[in-house]
Each structure stands twice: as C-alpha cells, then as structure tokens.
Amino acid sequence: MANLWDERAERYRTSAVHAGGPDLDLVVEWCDVERGTTVLDVATGGGHVARRLRELGAQVVTVDRSPGMQPDVIAPAEHLPFADRSFDVVVNRLAAHHFDSIPEAVAEFARIADRRVVVEDHRYTDEQTEQAEKLRDPSHVRSLSEDEWRSLLTAAGLEVEHATVYEMPLEFEDWLARTDTPEADRPRIRELLAPLSSEDGSTWLSPILIIGARRP
C-alpha cells in the first residue's frame, strides 16, 4: 500500500482540494494553536495541515506510512511511535477512510494527545457511495458516520467539542485522475454517484465530517 501512495504523492501535494478550502481553514481553527503548541499531523499526505499550522508558530511533527509523502516519521496511524500525551494536539485530515482499523487509530490519537484531537474525513453516506469510492480507489476501506466517530472518540476517553459537515465539491475528471481510475470503471462510478452529482455531471458533492474532541 505504501508503494501505491508513493506513486500518488505528488498529485496529493499539488491537489487544490487538499491544499485549501473552508474545510482546511476550520481544521486549523479547531486545532487552536499558538506559538510553541506541539502538533502531531497523522497521515500528513501532502503536508497541507502541517504547513498551515507551522505558519501560526506551532511545532509540527508529520507522520505517514508512505515514504513518498516525505513525513518526519514513517508509521501507520494504528501504531504511532510516540509517548502518551506527548503532543498538545493530534490532527488527521482526509485519510481515515484508508486506515486498516479506524478504532485502533483513534485510540492512538487519544493516547498521544494532551489537549485535543481534530479529525476530518469523508462521512458515510450510503452503500452505493461506498461502492463508488472503492471502485475508484481500492485503497478506500470505509467511511464512518458522525455517530460512529462520536462513539469512537468517546470510547477513547475524549469529549466531543465540535462537529460539522461540509459539502465538498469534487470535479469528476480531477478526482478520477488522481487515483488513475481505469477508464472502463468511470461510467459506473458516475452512475453510482448520480444522486450527489451536479446537473451537468461535472462534479459531485462529498459530505465531509470535521470533528474535534478534547481531553477532559
């Protein structure tokens, strides 16, 4: 799997969807950092969260299981090589649906965070949308509902502070190209996502959950 993400690394570093947007602004706001705040950015991908937080003076360590993403530390989200409560904030953006075990990853986030955890990911919509996501990208494991996220964070000993859903517009051609989706699969994906698509079929709206929790 790491080799797959090594191949995709540059596309995610330059992806406009990942590099900006009101969702990224909100994630940064909810991290609530100041100069010297320590942050662990898990599954950093293109490093966009880390860049924004560093601009605010935070001390950010990035971790990703893919060497091609050029993280500070190479490790999966489920097994993070850091001490308990060793970072003020743990943040994870647009990656959890690829994790082998989201519950294990959330337990790690809660173990390492001294203050809060902020997560952004595609929210579960229905099985039809999940089918489209997996057809587009076999590394997609599963998206969770807001209730599932709340339950996991609470079970890990955290208190949910904020939660909101952002409807992220995704251009089909760009979205499919980013994962080298075979041309033969693209019509079926468009068909599955028709209920969420624009009238002209050029884009679709993906519900994105942003949720923040704190240590009591």
Residue map of PLM features:
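Short catalytic micro-motifs in class I SAM-dependent methyltransferases
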Residues: 94-95
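A conserved beta-strand element that flanks and buttresses the S-adenosyl-L-methionine
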Residues: 91
